[in-house]
Amino acid sequence: MNGLILFCAVVFATAVCTYGSDAPCLRAGGRCQHDSITCSGRYRTGLCSGGVRRRCCVPSSSNSGSFSTGMVSQQCLRCICNVESGCRPIGCHWDVNSDSCGYFQIKRAYWIDCGSPGGDWQTCANNLACSSRCVQAYMARYHRRSGCSNSCESFARIHNGGPRGCRNSNTEGYWRRVQAQGCN
């Protein structure tokens, strides 16, 4: 039914049905279910249609898997991922004039610049392998053009501030947050 579901529940012998979309939960990498069912990760509220006990289960296993390989080290990717989302597929959030989505809080323009992997921006951003592949491709495209060094600091600041982010003083605070995750 194209993301639109009919949810019915029997409450005190009365059927209650609601129409709605589970798309916000799916974009967050989760699955809508009744909260009496064990969740292999954590429940998030407000992302599912239906009653108040129908919540989004975002599995902790969605965080497992590996980062794409490339010029950005695995450790550096992990630090950036932790700063952006706690390294979870957190869906999309409004940030500086547009939505930022997923593990690395990737904006649509960033996804286009990295070559549009995965066929769909939001799906890619909420997939660890695809989103890290996008970050690797973005760095391969921009880090030398802007005269930035091949360092985690440059990669983090470009990720935060765009192609010339390593030279922008506005990204220094972001770099300190990445450093606090154990990267240098």
Curated annotation (Swiss-Prot):
Residues 69-184 form the I-type lysozyme domain. It catalyses: Hydrolysis of (1->4)-beta-linkages between N-acetylmuramic acid and N-acetyl-D-glucosamine residues in a peptidoglycan and between N-acetyl-D-glucosamine residues in chitodextrins. The keyword Signal applies. Substrate binds at residues 107-113, 138, 159-161. Keywords: Antibiotic, Antimicrobial, Bacteriolytic enzyme, Disulfide bond, Glycosidase, Hydrolase, Secreted, Signal. GO terms for cellular component: extracellular region. Coiled coil: none annotated. GO terms for biological process: defense response to Gram-negative bacterium; defense response to Gram-positive bacterium; killing of cells of another organism. PANTHER family: DESTABILASE-RELATED, INVERTEBRATE-TYPE LYSOZYME 2-RELATED. Belongs to the glycosyl hydrolase 22 family. Type-I lysozyme subfamily. Has antibacterial activity against the Gram-positive bacteria L.garvieae, M.luteus and Enterococcus sp., and the Gram-negative bacteria E.coli and V.vulnificus. Weak antibacterial activity against the Gram-negative bacterium A.hydrophila. No antibacterial activity detected against the Gram-positive bacterium S.iniae or against the Gram-negative bacterium E.ictaluri. Shows some chitinase activity but no isopeptidase activity. This is Lysozyme 1. It comes from Crassostrea virginica (Eastern oyster). The lineage of its organism: Eukaryota, Metazoa, Spiralia, Lophotrochozoa, Mollusca.
